[in-house]
Regions:
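C-terminal catalytic/acceptor-binding lobe
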Residues: 136-212
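Glycine-rich, basic loop-to-helix element that forms the pyrophosphate-binding segment
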Residues: 55-72
Length: 212
């Protein structure tokens, strides 16, 4: 039986996230919701199952995802839903669990970006942690998707996981410095896998092709 909890990293979108917590407290009744606050904002939990985890520094996207996974899987949940702080996904936890049971897969995501995805514990165990060497944001999702591909894991893409409200890149628009590592992250991805996303050449990280 699938059991799911919710995780959301945030850094500077408290004014968007706070009203959403009211709505999530209803949709996720009885399940834990963990917020990783990388920006020391004023965010208040709604209900007994919501937790705000204050960080003294910015973990970045991958680091926040890892902390959420360790925390939620540590409670014994079989799946974690991870959302951006600038979207709203209007799905009831019971309906999500039912969907997962009817559509078994190694990973679930919408038809667009990874602003809303569901990761099973078994997949996290097989693939491992998200690569937090991709600093702040960008390419940590491409990296994980390629690692799943190398292991032959199934990715279930469906509009069921599309957000109902989406304000793209609000955090970077508010603080452009969060995007300062984009180029270095891109170069690291190429060095790690031998090409851009979907143009990878390596089957092992940082594999070197030696010509004789």
């Amino acid at each position: 039986m699938a059991t799911i909890a919710l995780g959301i990293p945030t850094i500077n979108q408290a004014e968007l996230l706070q009203p959403l917590l009211e709505r999530y407290s209803e949709n996720w009744y009885g399940r834990h919701t963990y917020i990783i606050d990388n920006g020391n904002q004023k965010i208040d939990p709604v209900g007994s199952k919501q937790r705000i985890v204050k960080m003294s520094y910015n973990l970045g996207v991958a680091g926040s995802w890892n902390l959420l996974c360790r925390t939620i899987f540590g409670f014994g949940y079989s799946h974690i839903a991870i959302l951006n702080d600038d979207i709203y996904w209007n799905k009831n936890a019971d309906d999500i669990e039912s969907y997962i049971e009817q559509n078994p897969a190694d990973f679930y995501v919408g038809l667009g970006q990874w602003c809303c995805f569901v990761l099973p514990y078994e997949t996290y165990e097989k693939v491992g942690m998200f690569d937090d060497k991709f600093v702040n944001a960008y390419f940590e999702d491409n990296d994980y998707e390629y690692r799943m591909k190398l292991l032959g894991l199934s990715v279930h893409k469906n509009e069921f996981f599309n957000p109902d409200e989406y304000k793209q890149s609000q955090s970077i628009r508010k603080d452009p410095s969060l995007n300062v590592n984009f180029e270095s992250n891109k170069m690291r991805y190429i060095e790690k896998w031998g090409g851009f996303p979907r143009e990878e050449k390596f089957t092992k990280p940082f594999e070197k092709i030696i010509a004789y």
